[in-house]
Swiss-Prot record:
Interacts with RAD51. Binds to the geminivirus mungbean yellow mosaic virus (MYMV) and to the tomato leaf curl virus (ToLCV) replication-associated proteins. A motif (DEAH box) lies at residues 322-325. Residues 538-696 form the Helicase C-terminal domain. Disruption phenotype: Increased sensitivity to gamma-irradiation and to the cross-linking reagent cisplatin. Reduced efficiency of somatic homologous recombination (HR). Reduced synthesis-dependent strand annealing (SDSA) frequency. Impaired geminiviral replication (e.g. tomato leaf curl virus (ToLCV)). The keyword ATP-binding applies. Keywords: ATP-binding, Cell cycle, Cell division, Coiled coil, DNA damage, DNA repair, DNA-binding, Helicase, Host-virus interaction, Hydrolase, Mitosis, Nucleotide-binding, Nucleus. This is Protein CHROMATIN REMODELING 25. One of its GO terms (molecular function) is helicase activity.
Length: 910
């Protein structure tokens, strides 16, 4: 019956019927009397009647089959119709709604309803953000981007078969390729080969981009993401949905970066600082099968809480994990939640893939390509144990050779899907940089408290009884805080926290001048609190010289918010403008602080940064100096923080200072960092040969000797090196010990020798440098033996540090990194000069006061010259009273500070 229906409703039958109707209508006009035509008309009418009755019967029985044919099929056919249907609708007319402004004006023109008895209209929640559509002509103009003549297209894949009709090449869009540097083009190609399966290995579907900070990992990953969202081997996109997981502080930054590079070409949603309902709604919108959203940007914590929403197999085709060292522990809930994704294409971004040990490195590798290195037990037995054993300073030659063989084998495997380039590549695009490790001796108060702590019975009992690790870590934290400033210990004692064990009865060691005479509260001795810490004293002079002599801005980094509080107090007392970013800073406010520091029109000077909260991903190029005030056990944290200023966009010379307290636990922590940095060679295959083999700087036995103090050395790190270069220049050391710092021996550098970055010439000490004070070539950061070794600050290639070191600096390591970009020289800030001139022209009692409450000082009493009068350093007195131009004779005749501690100095004394 269906065949009969099809025959009845065929196009030929319809044509016949139409012709018959036409003939019938012509016959009705009475012009044609031909009998054959009459017979034909009768037959056609009868056939139409039969067909109609038959169709009615089939319609009643439900067996009618209807066939429809398109009108003008050739005219209305669309090439690539499926791809066109996936695009969002755009009005064909050139004068359509091409901006939100027109639509907003039309909506706002409507009269609002005002209820009876009310003077204001009803507030209706309307969407505040409307998607602006663009016309077709404008979209076509944006798609056509011509490459400069000196830039070649980046073809990621090209078909080797001539018979492939769909796609012959996969290439990076010209809007992105014109911004890629050579190493970034290589990185995009490497990631594409891994995630697309072109690598050749069955168990490799992911990769780790382990470039150093500042090499553009974000841009490389965005380029890969956009290419896979648009192209594929069969003509359809290889990736339909992608998830970018990142720390909370970088969610908005990723959204801004994608908008910056590809604009609105990618439909994305970023879940940042949203309510729970908004997060759930956003995730549902993304995971909906027919959703237009292509990319989801989400934090690690948010993904962990809502991981069950992504259980569908089609919810993610590409996973990008930024700051992927967060996945170093495979037992965490975050790691397990991400590992449960069915997505095999995984791209991990981390500038520090090797952080503490090889076990953490295995966790990252196994997450990227599960099973590529076997299970955890096999890795631990076959790779980790021999490599760690061979790196010990006491290892035998056989153990060292076995470690080298296993390291080379591991390197060859992981380098199939790990790409790492050092920041030496940045030298072609950035100004020169110098890294300075500054060893500062502790003050008398710090040394007294330190010795009291390490000799306390509680500490000895805890170490003898093999106390819990948490208790030992508390002792280590207490010593590190003491190295920063005794004020942190004072606050701990007053608060009664557990960290006070070992500091019993220590309040009597603090000077009485630090407390109020009435209430006994801490007052800081009218600014003299700075001099209770060796590192803080050097920092205060460094800030003063920077503010007075240059227009440079500085970033102050610490692991403790209490230390940031001291930085803030110092800036307030000296009236330095500063910004602060720590864990309490909201996500929306962080980028505003960064923008304010990077704005050259703003009068900002110091940026206080918590290494835990803001050490990753921030671009602080508005500052060109950075101080790491205390070391972290994890070298990745310090490296991340130190890389904030030497990044794309930096125009000035960069100075990175690392402060260490001489002979204390801080030097041991830094040695441990260097040992961990040596593990990076496992993933750098070109450095696994015997000639570049390097072991641990700190043995396991040395690590047990954390609670010791060597206050009589210039640098404990340098003492353990047995540096041959410094032994050859021993005569220079003897001259320094005798106080003759200006003697220059026969080992002084020649004028024609290289000064990397021009730092020594800029500081005026190039012709005075000895061989040991110059670095050997371009050493790595962990190769301290090849750095410049300075027993005196006079030879340090940094004029500001020379003027700020004082007696507290005992030793300095320097490493100069070259840069091809000609730096902009620092100048004296005009605002600073005007402020100083204004202060000089004001009476003493009307000048800017150091105290934040800005109250006048008490009247100064005449000087008493009896035996109990304590000598005061003139420079300290001038600093305390905010006037560097007070006449010395005037001070001697009329001023007295009876409660200040006596300080020896080369100046005249009161």
């Amino acid at each position: 019956m269906e065949e009969e229906d099809e025959e009845i409703l065929s196009s030929s039958d319809c044509d016949d019927s139409s012709d018959s109707y036409k003939d019938d209508s012509q016959d009705s006009e009475g012009e044609n009397d031909n009998p054959e035509c009459e017979d034909l008309a009768v037959v056609s009418l009868s056939s139409d009647a039969d067909r109609k009755s038959k169709n009615v019967k089939d319609l009643l029985r439900g067996n009618l089959v209807v066939q429809r044919q398109p009108l003008l099929p050739r005219v209305l056919s669309v090439s690539d119709g499926a791809a066109v249907c996936r695009k969002p609708f755009k009005p064909p007319c050139s004068h359509g709604y091409d901006s939100t402004g027109q639509l907003s004006r039309r909506l706002s023109a409507r009269k609002r309803f005002v209820p009876w008895g009310s003077s204001t209209p009803v507030v209706v929640a309307l969407p505040t953000k409307l998607e602006a559509s663009t016309n077709i002509e404008r979209d076509e103009e944006e798609e056509v981007v011509c490459l400069p003549p000196d830039i070649e297209p980046l073809v990621l894949w090209q078909s080797e078969e001539d018979g492939m009709s769909n796609v012959t090449t996969i290439m990076v869009h010209s809007v992105l390729v014109k911004f890629l540097r050579p190493h970034q083009r290589e990185g995009v190609q490497f990631m594409f080969d891994c995630v697309s399966g072109l690598h050749g290995s069955a168990n490799i579907n992911g990769c780790i981009l382990a470039d150093d900070m500042g090499l553009g990992k974000t841009l490389q990953s965005i380029t890969l993401l956009y290419t896979l969202l648009c192209q594929g081997f069969d003509g359809t996109p290889m990736v339909k949905k992608a998830i970018i997981v990142t720390p909370t502080s970088l969610v908005s930054n990723w959204e801004a970066e994608i908008k910056k590079w590809v604009g609105d070409r990618i439909q994305l949603i970023a879940l940042c600082e949203s309510t729970r309902d908004d997060v759930l709604s956003g995730i549902d919108s993304f995971t909906r099968p027919r959703s237009a959203l292509q990319v989801l940007i989400i934090s690690y914590e948010t993904f962990r809480m809502h991981s069950s929403k992504f259980c569908q197999s089609e919810s993610c085709d590409l996973l990008i994990c930024d700051e992927a060292h967060r996945l170093k522990n495979d037992q965490t809930l975050t790691n397990r939640a991400l590992a449960s994704l069915t997505c095999k294409r995984r791209v991990l971004l981390s500038g520090t893939p090797m952080q503490n040990d090889l076990e953490e490195f295995f966790a990252m590798v196994n997450f990227t390509n599960p099973g590529s290195l076997g299970d955890a037990a096999h890795f631990r037995h076959y790779y980790e144990a021999p490599i760690i054993c061979g790196r010990e300073p006491t290892a035998t030659e056989e153990e060292k050779n076995l470690a080298a063989d296993r390291s080379a084998e591991l390197s060859s495997k992981v380098n199939q899907f790990i790409l790492r380039r050092t920041n030496a590549l940045l030298s072609n695009h950035l100004p020169p940089k110098i890294i300075e490790v500054v060893c500062c001796k502790m003050t008398t108060l710090q040394s007294t408290l330190y010795n009291h702590f390490i000799s306390s019975k509680n500490l000895k009992r805890a170490l003898a009884d093999n106390a819990k690790q948490t208790k030992v870590l508390a002792y280590i934290t207490a010593l590190k805080k003491l190295c920063n400033h005794p004020k942190l210990i004072y606050d701990t004692i007053k608060s009664g926290n557990p960290g006070t064990v070992g500091f019993e009865n220590c309040l009597e060691f603090f000077p009485a001048e630090m407390f109020s005479g009435r209430s006994g509260a801490w007052t800081g001795g009218d600014g003299a609190w700075v001099e209770l810490s060796g590192k803080m004293h050097v920092l205060s002079r460094l800030l003063a010289n920077l503010r007075r002599k240059t227009d440079d801005r500085i970033v102050l980094v610490s692991n403790y918010t209490q230390t940031l509080d001291l930085f803030a107090q110092l800036c307030r007392e000296r009236r330095y403008p500063f910004l602060r970013l720590d864990g309490s800073t909201t996500i929306s406010k962080r980028q505003k602080l960064v923008n304010r520091l990077n704005d050259p029109t703003k009068d900002e000077f110091a940026f206080l940064l918590s290494s835990k909260a803001g050490g990753c991903g921030l671009n602080l190029i508005g500052a060109n100096r950075l101080v790491l005030f205390d070391p972290d056990w994890n070298p990745a944290n310090d490296k991340q923080a130190a890389a904030r200023v030497w990044r794309d966009g930096q125009k000035k010379r960069v100075y990175v200072y690392r402060f260490l307290s001489t002979g204390t636990i801080e030097e041991k922590v830094y040695q441990r960092q260097m040992s961990k940095e040596g593990l990076q060679k496992v993933i750098q295959h070109e450095q696994t040969d015997n000639s570049t083999r390097q072991g641990n700087l700190l043995s396991t036995e040395d690590l047990r000797d954390l609670f010791s103090f060597h206050g009589d050395v210039r640098s404990e790190i340098h003492e353990k090196m047995s540096c041959s270069r410094c032994q050859n220049d021993a005569s220079g050391t003897e001259n320094i010990e005798e106080g003759n710092e200006n003697n220059v021996d026969d080992n002084a550098c020649q004028i024609d020798q290289e000064d990397i970055g021009g730092f020594a010439k800029d500081a005026g000490c190039f012709n005075l440098l000895k061989n040991s004070e110059r670095q050997v070539g371009t050493p790595l950061e962990e190769d301290l033996g090849s750095w410049g070794h300075h027993f005196t600050s006079k030879s340090v290639p940094d004029a500001i540090l020379q003027a700020s070191a004082g007696d507290e600096v005992t030793f300095v390591f320097t490493n100069q990194v070259d840069g091809k970009l000609v730096p902009i020289e620092s100048n004296v800030s005009p605002k600073t000069v005007e402020s100083e001139e204004h202060n000089r022209n004001q009476p003493v009692n009307k000048r800017a006061f150091n105290k934040p409450q800005q109250r006048p000082r008490e009247p100064l009493q005449p000087l008493s010259l009896n035996e109990t009068t304590k000598r005061v350093k003139l420079s300290t007195y001038k600093r305390l009273h905010g006037n560097s131009n007070i006449d010395d004779a005037q001070i001697k005749m009329s001023l007295q500070r009876p409660n200040l501690v006596s300080v020896n100095h080369d100046d005249d004394f009161v």
